[in-house]
Amino acid sequence: MWDNAEAMERLTRWLLVMMAMLLAASGLVWFYNSNHLPVKQVSLKGNLVYSDKKALGSLAKEYIHGNILRTDINGAQEAYRRYPWIASVMVRRRFPDTVEVVLTERKPVARWGDHALVDGEGNVFEARLDRPGMPVFRGAEGTSAEMLRRYDEFSTVLAKQGLGIKEMTYTARSAWNVVLDNGITVRLGRENEMKRLRLFTEAWQHLLRKNKNRLSYVDMRYKDGFSVRHAPDGLPEKESEE
């Protein structure tokens, strides 16, 4: 082998490559364990409307500090994911001295019961928001996405009559009740909800609107008609649609 020039040349190249790799690895280890390359800036990016920016900044300082190679990127990401208003987060290094945090905030569209909110994807999260007039959803755990979908469908139909939804309930027996923004409850039941709601809007346009101040609820669960209650203590009155 020692007399083979070609083999010696290959061995020399291999040794040089190995030395270069060892030097590079040693350099990285030295940088990783040194106080060089400190994080000097944390850049928070995202359209943040509801989040506490001061709290988010404090969260960054808790995890992102020291050598940029050793700073706890994964810990920071997990901490931001636990923050109620944050829907998604991406934390990345920007050499030589910056860590960038890109945040996507939840957009609240409804209240979930008395203590939580629903975002635009139908996810429930616990946060405080002082916004009067938001619709309230009441349903079993795991039904928020379906309730949001139905809310959009129901709202489209009701808006044609100038009506909105104040509260919507999806009962344990899979029945739908809707409280309108004028305080009237519409009972749709557990089947043919859209058909019943359209029948309600027709009845509203031609019959019920003129008596709206006297109505407590309208029950649309009848096959050929509906019933109304004029006062909390009154008796229901059957109205035929035919």
Swiss-Prot record:
Keyword line: Cell cycle, Cell division, Cell inner membrane, Cell membrane, Membrane, Transmembrane, Transmembrane helix
Superkingdom of origin: Bacteria
Periplasmic topological intervals: 33-242
Main localization of the protein described in the UniProt heading: membrane
Name of the protein in its database record: Cell division protein FtsQ
HAMAP family with a match to the protein in the record: FtsQ_subfam (MF_00911)
Family the UniProt entry places it in: Belongs to the FtsQ/DivIB family. FtsQ subfamily.
GO cellular component: cell division site; plasma membrane
Chain ranges of the POTRA domain: 37-106
Transmembrane segments: 13-32
GO biological process, one term: cell septum assembly
Subcellular location: Cell inner membrane
InterPro entries registered for this protein in UniProt: Cell_div_FtsQ/DivIB_C, FtsQ, FtsQ_C_sf, POTRA, POTRA_FtsQ_type
Side of membrane Cytoplasmic, spans: 1-12
Membrane topology: Single-pass type II membrane protein
Keyword Coiled coil among UniProt keywords: no
Subunit structure: Part of a complex composed of FtsB, FtsL and FtsQ.
